Amino acid sequence: MARYRCCRSKSRSRCRRRRRRCRRRRRRCCRRRRRRCCRRRRSYTFRCKRY
């Protein structure tokens, strides 16, 4: 099974270090391509990365 993680950086190495999840709505990363996972604050937009 492929693992999906929410990341704000484009580099895969940084995404592997930290996993981000949406605590308010309890949403995980999307499973369809690269859609938005959860929004935190104003400047940060987390997207779904597949590894």
UniProtKB/Swiss-Prot annotation:
Q: How is it modified after translation?
A: Phosphorylated by SRPK1.
Q: Does the keyword DNA-binding apply?
A: yes
Q: Name one GO cellular component term.
A: nucleosome
S-S bonds: 7-15, 38-48
Lineage top rank: taxon: Eukaryota
What GO molecular-function term can you cite, just one?
DNA binding
Tissue expression pattern: Testis.
**How does this protein assemble?**
Cross-linked by interchain disulfide bonds around the DNA-helix.
Biological function? Protamines substitute for histones in the chromatin of sperm during the haploid phase of spermatogenesis. They compact sperm DNA into a highly condensed, stable and inactive complex.
Q: What is this protein called?
A: Sperm protamine P1
Q: What organism is listed for this UniProt entry? A: Rattus norvegicus (Rat)
